[in-house]
Amino acid sequence: MSEFDTLADLVEVTEKLIPFNRILGVRDCRIDDDGVARIRVYHCEDLVGNFARGFLHGGVVAATLDVAGGIAAMMAVVGRTPPKTREEAGRVFSNISTIDMRIDYLRPGVGEWFDASASVLRSGSRVVVTRMEFHNDEGTLVAVGTGTYIVG
């Protein structure tokens, strides 16, 4: 059994081991000192929804917010009961799933890159609720969301 390093292992899982996150191009996974989960995705042709204007697809926005919310939920669980090994962390993380999500799209996804952030609104023994934001490379708020995750 190998020792669990919270942030390093979370980055590896988020950026490398989850196939869909690789398709999205999730990068720069980090947790701020105040506990906010942050990730970045870069604009590319494969993620465009409006080909005439080059806007990011709304599903990409939603999926990226879901990834950020899921990271925040994982960190809430880890904060309560830190796993000691990677195997234990894998069991904990494999039980976390999105059960509800609401996204409000405020403007088109225009930019070279986009940052998604998520913070925990409530962390219970079975459910974690997060608040997410999606900003473009100019810091303009593109979308907001609320995600609910089953964690136990």
What are these regions (language model features)?
Residues 1-152:
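Terminal targeting signals and extreme-terminal segments of soluble enzymes
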